[in-house]
């Protein structure tokens, strides 16, 4: 069979936007840095792309400039001590202290006390810069001077066309602004934290062009990464030179270290890059411009780059305070050339999927989602930290990341034959392993217990949910196993063996023996978080039981491959996990009353789907449970990753028609916008676990898994309506 024409597949899904779509800005990025742009190709009109604050604070925007290294903390209030949030919970082996918090109202945690709120909100991810177009001041404007510029209003926005060329990673925007036609080209260097912008004024319009860079303070808001109300809490300093300048950013004044966090010394973290420099600089921007461009500071936190001609070229290199700026000449053409070289190589690597021959009317949309999800996860889920749920679009949960979602963001990289993109974030676990081991030790367990919601320092966040989750724990083993299968097995086992070992030690120790086998909880909240109020008595959710059994088996095989003797306890626990409760012929969600609440994630069936087959779950009972979910579930309460999870279950059960139906089910939270993002709600307008989950499901459905019977593309119907050409997938376990 001929190789897939990958360029044709990708170019079928070039993103074209006419006018303002307030939910669907475009992005450029490289995994470490990303820029979201409006219809002007920059961030001229952030108010047209709003994101409300769940607590009722100032509205944020989808137009963020975010990185993996840009973090900030406001000064710590008295009493903000994580140990003070620990509460005793009864367990089968006695009292154990857990980080805890009062119940929350959805994402609104504003009612918490100041100390607890600080621990939840710091460090938070920064919006590094707001980069937007200015327009020339008319000569007849009151007080106007030749060469002056002003911010345009949305009323001055005319016709516009915008294209995201996925093959080159470049956004081209043609827009009429204040009566002048402009062409704006935007790109990000694939290997450096460097943005490039070229603005060209149409020959028929008066000359003169300018770009403004504005800098906010860090924000403790749940979704708004920029605080524009505290200009006195930070400093912006411009130093000019021929052909550009440098902007130094100091947060919380110049007297002490700026609050860009993430390195050794931040509550015990080690090895995570991103510390403030010794000079108190939080981060810096190196500006490269045309020789005739003017660069000036026009306000306390504003810098303007302008030219009296028709072309403005601007390169913005960003770096944390302790890091050097980009060495050597970097030009707009250089960045565009680097992007045009990188992205065809990206698309040519790993796996590809071509559904063009299918007659099912949904095939084109599935292929579109798969192509755009590859781009979106590459530019914001392939960095040095586990991603936040909104990637690098803007903040959710203040930019902090959730380890139970790491698998959903990034497992697909290995399954699609790009394991190096997953490996970038795996090193973070090494950095915070001492803290994870300390948590386990404090609770009386062996090994390392991985937290739920964290910043780069790995410190837990007080919550009535997060500290009681367990299903993030096996993810480390699962991700490492996917890397082993996709790459050099011996190297991967040597590299990640200690992480797998410490993860498994906790898993084997936290499981408690009972009359029917080894069980989990209490306290415990399953992946289906509907049982938060019952955490002090929840036991034995089916997904977690199956995941425990499978992951401990994988860890044991790793020990043997490493030359170590098997760990008897791991076999005893893994093979002896209690079977989950069955009621009325289906699996109950938990082992105690009320047994099953029919909201949130229907995770009772994910232990055969996300997780390979084990002896813990009976496929016939999983099938019956899936049927009951289909018949009666509160679908609006599900999340974007539930649909690929359900599709994986249907696939492993041998029901490909249902798998496709579930993957593309028409539900509000399974919407993929024109830009490819999986929208959930107004304040969660991008949701990368949905994109990564879709790619993981497609990999299973197309590439198959061990012991799948050998049928090609086993997750797609074999009725002639789906013609699934694929290459390069790594079979799932």
What annotation goes with each model-predicted range?
Residues 383-396, 437-452, 459, 509-525, ...:
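Glycine- and aromatic-rich loop/turn segments at beta-sheet edges
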Residues 502-558:
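Acidic/histidine-rich catalytic neighborhood
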Residues 1-262, 271-399, 419, 429-435, ...:
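Acidic/polar, glycine-enriched structural segments that form the non-catalytic walls/loops
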Residues 2, 177-223, 229-235, 240-246, ...:
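Beta-rich accessory regions
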Residues 343-358, 384-392, 423-427, 440-445, ...:
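Short coil/turn segments at secondary-structure boundaries
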Residues 43, 48, 402-435, 455-459, ...:
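Active-site core of glycosidic bond-cleaving carbohydrate-active enzymes
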């Amino acid at each position: 069979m001929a190789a897939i024409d990958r360029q044709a597949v990708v170019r079928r899904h070039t993103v074209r936007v006419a006018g303002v779509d307030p939910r669907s800005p475009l992005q450029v990025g490289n995994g470490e840095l990303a820029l979201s742009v409006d219809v002007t190709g920059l961030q001229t009109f952030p108010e047209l792309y709003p994101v409300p604050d769940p607590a009722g604070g100032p509205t944020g925007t989808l137009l963020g400039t975010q990185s993996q290294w840009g973090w900030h903390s406001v000064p710590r209030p008295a009493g903000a001590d994580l140990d003070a949030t620990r509460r005793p919970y009864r367990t089968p082996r006695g009292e154990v202290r857990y980080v805890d918090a009062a119940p929350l109202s959805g994402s609104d945690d504003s009612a918490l006390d100041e100390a607890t709120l600080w621990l939840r909100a710091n460090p938070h991810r920064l919006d590094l810069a707001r980069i937007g177009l200015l327009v020339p001041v008319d000569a007849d404007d009151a007080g106007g001077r030749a060469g002056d510029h002003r911010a345009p209003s949305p009323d001055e926005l005319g016709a516009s066309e915008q294209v995201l060329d996925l093959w080159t990673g470049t956004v081209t925007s043609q827009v009429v602004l204040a009566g002048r036609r402009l062409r704006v080209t935007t790109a990000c260097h694939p290997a450096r934290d460097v943005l490039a912008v070229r603005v060209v004024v149409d020959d028929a319009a008066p000359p003169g062009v300018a770009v403004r860079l504005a800098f906010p303070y860090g924000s403790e808001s749940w979704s708004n990464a920029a605080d524009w109300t505290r200009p006195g809490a930070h400093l912006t300093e411009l130093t000019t030179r021929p052909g550009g300048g440098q902007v130094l950013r100091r947060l919380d004044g110049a007297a002490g270290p700026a609050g860009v966090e993430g390195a050794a010394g931040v509550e015990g973290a080690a090895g995570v890059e991103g510390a403030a420099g010794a000079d108190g600089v939080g981060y810096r921007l190196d500006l490269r411009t045309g020789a005739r461009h003017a660069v000036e500071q026009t306000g306390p936190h504003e810098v303007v780059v302008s030219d009296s001609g028709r072309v403005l070229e601007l390169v913005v290199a960003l770096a944390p305070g302790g890091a050097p700026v980009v060495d050597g000449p970097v030009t707009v053409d250089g960045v565009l050339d680097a992007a045009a070289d990188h992205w065809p190589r990206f698309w040519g690597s790993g796996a590809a999927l071509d559904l063009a021959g299918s007659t099912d009317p949904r095939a084109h949309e599935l292929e579109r989602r798969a192509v755009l999800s590859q781009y979106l996860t590459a530019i914001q889920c392939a960095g040095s930290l586990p991603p936040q749920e909104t990637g690098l679009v803007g903040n959710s949960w203040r930019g902090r990341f959730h380890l139970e979602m790491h698998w959903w963001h990034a497992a697909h990289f290995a399954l699609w034959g790009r394991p190096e993109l997953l490996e970038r974030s795996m090193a973070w676990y090494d950095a915070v392993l001492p803290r994870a081991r300390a948590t386990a030790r404090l609770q009386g367990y062996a090994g390392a217990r991985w937290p739920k919601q964290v910043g780069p320092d790995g410190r837990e966040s007080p919550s009535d949910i997060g500290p009681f989750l367990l299903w993030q724990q096996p993810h480390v083993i699962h991700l490492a196993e996917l890397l082993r299968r996709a790459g050099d097995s011996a190297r991967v086992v040597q590299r990640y063996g200690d992480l797998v070992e410490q993860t498994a030690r906790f898993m084997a120790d936290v499981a408690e023996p009972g009359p029917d086998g080894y069980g989990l909880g209490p306290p415990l909240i399953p992946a289906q978080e509907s049982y938060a109020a019952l955490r002090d008595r929840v036991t034995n959710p089916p997904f977690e039981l199956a995941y425990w059994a499978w992951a401990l088996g994988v860890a044991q095989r790793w020990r043997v491959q490493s030359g170590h003797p098997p760990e008897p306890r791991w076999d005893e626990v893994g093979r002896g996990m209690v079977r989950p409760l069955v009621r009325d012929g289906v699996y109950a969600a938990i082992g105690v009353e009320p047994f099953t609440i029919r909201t949130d994630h229907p995770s009772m069936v994910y232990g055969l789907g996300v997780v390979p087959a084990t002896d813990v779950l009976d496929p016939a009972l999983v099938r019956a449970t899936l049927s009951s979910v289909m018949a009666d579930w509160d679908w609006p309460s599900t999340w974007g990753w539930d649909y690929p999870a359900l599709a994986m279950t249907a696939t492993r059960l041998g029901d490909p028609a249902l798998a496709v139906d579930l993957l593309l089910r028409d539900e509000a939270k399974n919407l993929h916008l024109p830009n490819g993002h999986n929208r959930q709600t107004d304040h969660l307008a991008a949701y990368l676990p949905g994109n990564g989950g879709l790619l993981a499901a497609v990999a299973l459905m197309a590439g198959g898994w061990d012991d799948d019977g050998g049928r090609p593309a086993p997750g797609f119907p074999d009725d002639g309506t789906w013609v699934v050409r694929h290459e390069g997938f790594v079979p799932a376990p």
